[in-house]
Amino acid sequence: TFGGINLEDIKAPECFEIERRLVEELEIPVMHDDQHGTAIITSAALMNAAEMMGKNISDMKVVVVGAGASAIACSTMYKELGVKNLIMCDSKGVIHKGRTDLNKYKKDFITQTDITTMNEAFTDADMVLGLSKPGTFTIEHIKLMS
């Protein structure tokens, strides 16, 4: 037999600490579906989109709208795949260096650009991943994309 743990519907940031502790203390696989399942599926979509557009992943502008467990896991995986221009937005807008209200997990995704607004984030974006509440972005934002 083979055992493992699948965590489900645990909100951020608590889910990161729970997962970390389980991984450290147990010798069985631990998966948080909200993080890892979403990251795997959307990474496949990102790779397919890059191929279809004839672009290198490292040259793509990726916007992640949402900053919970799924968004952080997806963004982490995208960086591992080579995305260099990743802009994360939470309920207060773009996660940028001028923000003073960020937890340690969001701080890892402070944009390395001068972008501070959603309109700037969406302008010429190659991909947008929406992992936030409905209405966070609009069709007007989509029209700003590549």
Q: Which residue stretches match the model-derived regions?
A:
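Glycine/serine-rich phosphate-binding loop and adjoining beta1-alpha1 elements at the start
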Residues: 1-60
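Short, well-ordered coil/turn residues at beta-beta hairpins
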Residues: 8, 130-131
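Glycine-rich nucleotide phosphate-binding loop and flanking beta-alpha elements
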Residues: 11-13, 71, 135-137
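Short glycine-/acidic-enriched loop or helix-start segments at secondary-structure transitions
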Residues: 16-17, 74, 98, 138-140
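Rossmann-fold NAD(P) dinucleotide-binding segment
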Residues: 18-25, 115, 123-124, 133-146
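Glycine-rich phosphate/diphosphate-binding loop of Rossmann-like nucleotide-binding domains
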Residues: 40-129
